[in-house]
Amino acid sequence: MQLYALGLNHHTAPLAIRERVAFQPDRLDQALQALTDSRTVSEAAILSTCNRTELYFAAEQPQRAADWLAGFHQLPLAQVSPYLYSYPQRDAVRHVFRVASGLDSMVLGEPQILGQVKEAARRAEEAGTLGTLLHKLFQNTFAVAKEVRSTTAIGANIVSMAAAAVHLTGRIFERVSDQHVLFIGAGEMIELCAAHFAGAGPRSMTVANRTEARAEALAARLGAQTMRLDAIADALPRFDVVVSCTASPLPIVGLGMVERAVKVRRHRPIVMVDLAVPRDVEPEVGQLDDVFLYTVDDLAQVVDAGIESRQQAVVEAEGIIDQRVDGFLHWLHARDAVPTIRALREHAETLRRGEIERALRQLAKGEDPQAVLDALSHGLTNKLMHGPTRFLTQAEGEGQAEASRVVQQLFNLSRHD
């Protein structure tokens, strides 16, 4: 069973074609069931956005997927096929990683695509078409996309320390104007950051501070709301962006609090910018899949990188993706070997049991134990070596050299052993 990606996008097809093969959300379950009912496809997920329609699937033979895509939309295959691309295994994995990381987007590094890929995986899981291969693929995809966005400047052009928080948010959310922002603290750094966010026109801003009077004063200047610190835990799911900088000696935002918020948000991403020293947000929060946590050091590094970091980020992102593709394919190949490993062990166990039973019969007859053990070891050795020996002696011509190489590698032999 192999993984494949098939589809078309803004690089290969005009809008007039893309809109004709887009999947409506209310027909997605039906489409997934129909695709996997075709017998040639065992697992499937469908990503359908304004700029792309892609099928990610596991199959023995991928050819019929294009026929199915055209047929589902009642289009002649000849009308669709000139715009289609099809990627097998390695190329498919790399493509999905690049898509989710924003490297294949119309706007380089745009953040919405990751949420759309997550939604495609969720819909496939709900429809029962997300099997072991695709589940593992999407797990790796989300981890790669997060690594790319967290460790490169693929979606940002940072120009100042205070503006960095807004630009870091822009890596994850295309429009800050659609987001709800929470500021924890009311000192100078928070005020500077809040001014930059206000310039981006977020949907709402809220200030939480230990001293309510300072929170109210800052909120009044920004046209923001206020909140008590002890209300953050319950209110956190409402916010898409959290910027914190207090003088608290202990973290204000804990792992459990954020885990609950992510669950309530149905895994919509949340950006946390922690400018405090000591930190206001527990570091473990950064390990959560849907949380993008940045510290004061992260902002400093991005500022130092400057405007040229964007093109360098593409190179860095491609390097990350290439490494992660190799890792995923290693898992795939190891998984493919499992049936052979199981059969090999079962074969060896059958031989072992046969020799043990023969030895026990000989011992029951009163034969010399040392002789019985010698016979057992020789018998087991001969039976285990019979297959490799036969493999070598039956090889002919150029195949004999290859057979010798395989056996030497298999048993960790050198030519002088």
From Swiss-Prot:
Functional pathway: Porphyrin-containing compound metabolism; protoporphyrin-IX biosynthesis; 5-aminolevulinate from L-glutamyl-tRNA(Glu): step 1/2
InterPro entries referenced in this protein's UniProt entry, alphabetically: 4pyrrol_synth_GluRdtase, 4pyrrol_synth_GluRdtase_dimer, 4pyrrol_synth_GluRdtase_N, GluRdtase_CS, GluRdtase_dimer_dom_sf, GluRdtase_N_sf, NAD(P)-bd_dom_sf, Shikm_DH/Glu-tRNA_Rdtase
Reactions catalysed according to its record: (S)-4-amino-5-oxopentanoate + tRNA(Glu) + NADP(+) = L-glutamyl-tRNA(Glu) + NADPH + H(+)
SUPFAM superfamilies recorded: Glutamyl tRNA-reductase catalytic, N-terminal domain, Glutamyl tRNA-reductase dimerization domain, NAD(P)-binding Rossmann-fold domains
GO BP terms: protoporphyrinogen IX biosynthetic process from glutamate
Keywords in alphabetical order: NADP, Oxidoreductase, Porphyrin biosynthesis
The keyword Hydrolase is annotated on this UniProt entry: no
Top-level class of the enzyme under EC nomenclature: oxidoreductase
Site residues, Important for activity: 95
GO molecular function annotations of the record: glutamyl-tRNA reductase activity; NADP binding
UniProt cross-references to CDD domains, sorted A to Z: NAD_bind_Glutamyl_tRNA_reduct
EC number: 1.2.1.70
Binding site for substrate: 49-52, 105, 110-112, 116
Pfam name, any one: GlutR_dimer
Keyword Ligase appears in the UniProt entry: no
Active site: 50
Note: During catalysis, the active site Cys acts as a nucleophile attacking the alpha-carbonyl group of tRNA-bound glutamate with the formation of a thioester intermediate between enzyme and glutamate, and the concomitant release of tRNA(Glu). The thioester intermediate is finally reduced by direct hydride transfer from NADPH, to form the product GSA.
Protein family (similarity comment): Belongs to the glutamyl-tRNA reductase family.
NCBIfam families registered for this protein in UniProt: hemA
Role this protein plays: Catalyzes the NADPH-dependent reduction of glutamyl-tRNA(Glu) to glutamate 1-semialdehyde (GSA).
Domain statement: Possesses an unusual extended V-shaped dimeric structure with each monomer consisting of three distinct domains arranged along a curved 'spinal' alpha-helix. The N-terminal catalytic domain specifically recognizes the glutamate moiety of the substrate. The second domain is the NADPH-binding domain, and the third C-terminal domain is responsible for dimerization.
Subunit structure: Homodimer.
HAMAP family reported for this sequence: Glu_tRNA_reductase
Protein name, per record: Glutamyl-tRNA reductase
